[in-house]
Amino acid sequence: MKLNNVSLSYGKKVVASNINAQLLPGELVCLVGRNGAGKSTLIKHILNIYPDPKLISVVLTDKIDVERLTVRDVVAMGRMPYTGFFGKLTKHDEEVVTSSIKLLGMEDFADRQFTTLSDGERQKAIIAKALAQETPYILLDEPTAFLDHPSKVSCMKLLRSLCKEQGKAILISTHDIEVALQECDKVWWMADGTLREMTVDSFSPNLL
C-alpha cells in the first residue's frame, strides 16, 4: 500500500499535504500525532483510495447500530464481502468467525447481545469482526481505547502476531504510545501539516 503526494482536507481546511509513505506486508505501523493532526482523516482517505473490502478491513471509533445482534452476529458481519449482505455462512465462514472470537478471548460473550457489552468488550468484538474479514491489510483507529492496561498489551501482541505469522500489514492510530511502541515496527508521525516515517528508536513521545 503506497501513499504518493497525498493531501488531506477537513472541510475546506487542508490539514496535511505531501504525504508519502508505504505499508508493507508483515509490518505493524503506529500512526501518531496530536489531536487534529489528521490521523483519522488519513485512515478514511486510505479507505477511499482502496475501497475493496476484501483488501482492507477497518476498525473505526464510530459506534455501530447493531440492536438485537449477538457478538457472534457482529463478528459474522466481517464475512459479508464473501457472502453478500443476506448470504448464508458456509462451514468455512463459521470456522473463521469462531476463530476470530477466540483470538480476542470473547468465547464467553459470543451469544450475548452486543448492546449489553461494556465499551471495552465492544471494542474487542469489533476487532474480531475485522479479523473475520480476512484481509491482507487492517486499519485501526484507536483500537486500544476503552481497554484496561493488560488488555491493551494483549491487543498489541495479537496484532504483532498477525503481522509475523500471517503476513498482514496493520496500521494503528493510537494515543497509547508507550504500549504501541513496544510492538510496532515503525512510526508514522503526523505533525506540521505532513507525515514523517520514522523508526521506533528514533521516535520519542516527547515529540507530541
Model-derived regions: residue spans:
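Helix-to-loop junction immediately C-terminal to a conserved catalytic motif
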Residues: L47
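H-loop/switch region of ABC-family ATPase nucleotide-binding domains
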Residues: T174-H175
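The feature captures the beta-strand-to-loop junction immediately N-terminal to the Walker
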Residues: V32-R34
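Conserved structural motif at the start of ABC-family nucleotide-binding domains
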Residues: M1-L3, V15-N18
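Catalytic Walker B motif of ABC-type/P-loop ATPase nucleotide-binding domains
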Residues: I138-D141
